[in-house]
Amino acid sequence: MDYLTHKLLDPTRAKSCIQSIQRDQSLWKDGKSTAGLYASKVKNNLQLDKKSKVSIDNSNLIIKAIISDLLVKSFTIPRKVHGVMFSKSSKGNSYGMHLDNAYMSTGRSDLSFTLFLSDPGEYEGGELAIETIQETRKIKLPQGHIIIYPSTTLHSVEEVTSGTRIVCVGWIQSYIPNNEDRKILFSLDAGAKGLLAAHGQSHELDLVFQSYNNLLRRLGG
C-alpha cells in the first residue's frame, strides 16, 4: 500500500477548525508565496498566514493528532511533522501537477499529507489527483479524513467548480526514509499486532517484535 486514508478528526473537530481559521479573512494570502519556483506557476489557491496565532494553534492541534494516532504512526514512523499549512480553494481554483520539494526549510519531505476539513458535499471538484505508473487516482475524502502518500509522487488538485474546499497539508520526515522499507515494516507491525490480539504473547511473537525493532535500527536514517 503506497498511501493511507484514515479518519483523523471527527466532523465536529474539523468544523471547529474551519470556524477558527475562517474568522479573519484578511489572514488568507496568495498560495504562490509558499510554493517553489516551478510549482508556483501552477498553484492557484489561498493559504492561511503561517505566522498567525490561529494558524500556529490549529497546526499544533493537528500535529498532535497525527503523532498520537497509532495507525498513522505505524504507517509513517514519524521523526517530525512539519510545514503544516491551511489551504482554501474556491470556484476556479486548482493546483496543477507538481512534485513536493525534497528538502524544505522545516525538514525533509518523505511523506505528504492532506487532511480534508470541508464536508465533501460543500464543494464540487477539488479532488486530489495522485499519479501512479498506470493511472491517476482521484481522491476526495469525508470531513476529518487524512490521506498520507510518498512525497516522491506527482500530484495535483482538480479545479473547484463550486463551493469552497478547505484542507490542511503538510509533510512528515520519517525515521525510515525509503518508502519500500516503510511498507515492509508497516506490514510486519500490523501482522505482529494482529497475532498478539488473536493469540496473546508468546516467545515466537517476541522474536517477531525483536526483528521489527532491529530492522528499525538498521533501516533508520
From Swiss-Prot:
Fe cation binds at residues 98, 100, 155. Residues 80-174 form the Fe2OG dioxygenase domain. Signal peptide: none annotated. 2-oxoglutarate binds at residue 165. Pfam families: 2OG-FeII_Oxy_3 (PF13640). GO terms for molecular function: 2-oxoglutarate-dependent dioxygenase activity; iron ion binding; L-ascorbic acid binding. The keyword DNA-binding does not apply. Disulfide bonds: none annotated. GO terms for biological process: DNA damage response; intracellular iron ion homeostasis. Its cofactor is Fe(2+); L-ascorbate. Its EC number is 1.14.11.-. InterPro entries: Oxoglu/Fe-dep_dioxygenase_dom, PKHD_hydroxylase, Pro_4_hyd_alph, Pro_4_hyd_alph_FE2OG_OXY. Binds 1 Fe(2+) ion per subunit. It is an enzyme of class 1 (oxidoreductase). This is PKHD-type hydroxylase Pro_1271. It comes from Prochlorococcus marinus (strain SARG / CCMP1375 / SS120).
